[in-house]
Amino acid sequence: IVSQIFRKIMNEKAKYYIQKLQLEKHPEGGYFREIYRSGEMISIEEPKKNFKRNVSTSIYFLLEGPQISKFHRLKSDELWHFYDGGSVKVYVIDEEGKLTEIILGKKIEEGEVFQTVIKKNNWFAAEVINKRSFALIGCTVSPGFDFSDFELADRKYLLETFPKHKSLISEFTKP
């Protein structure tokens, strides 16, 4: 009974945030809304191209317990900030294949952190640890987010590139 009450409270709180913050479904899983986009632009160079990006962008991002953020990567660094709900485990695979697990949450004495940085070009995914809970976080990207800089992982590519992380990749990618 206690777990049913907890689940109901968490579901209501998640729905409250989705409604009050006007969050929409995110393509990689969860809900989001952009809340800031810098008016200042900077140039970023890529091979044979020169792009302009906002200096910085920020979103609210909410995951409900069973939802996951699938493996993806960005061409900019992204800071994740914990706001409310249950702890979130973030899985990061760097360009050399090293896996790092970071837990965002309120339990500082247990090693959880309020924010973390995911470096550009690293593959990352996330999940709420307690599947009966939710997590509200903020994501700040600099240089600013642009959907053309977002790459949702291809399972086959990740499995070929990082075979030692097969079970995690299979769980956090589309078949």
Where do the model's predicted regions map?
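Non-catalytic, conserved peripheral segments adjacent to functional cores
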Residues: 10-116, 125-126, 131-133, 143, ...
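Short, Lys/Arg-enriched N-terminal segments with co-localized hydrophobic residues
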Residues: 1-9
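Histidine-centered acyl-transfer/condensation active-site motif
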Residues: 140
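Extracellular beta-helix/beta-solenoid repeat scaffolds
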Residues: 119-121
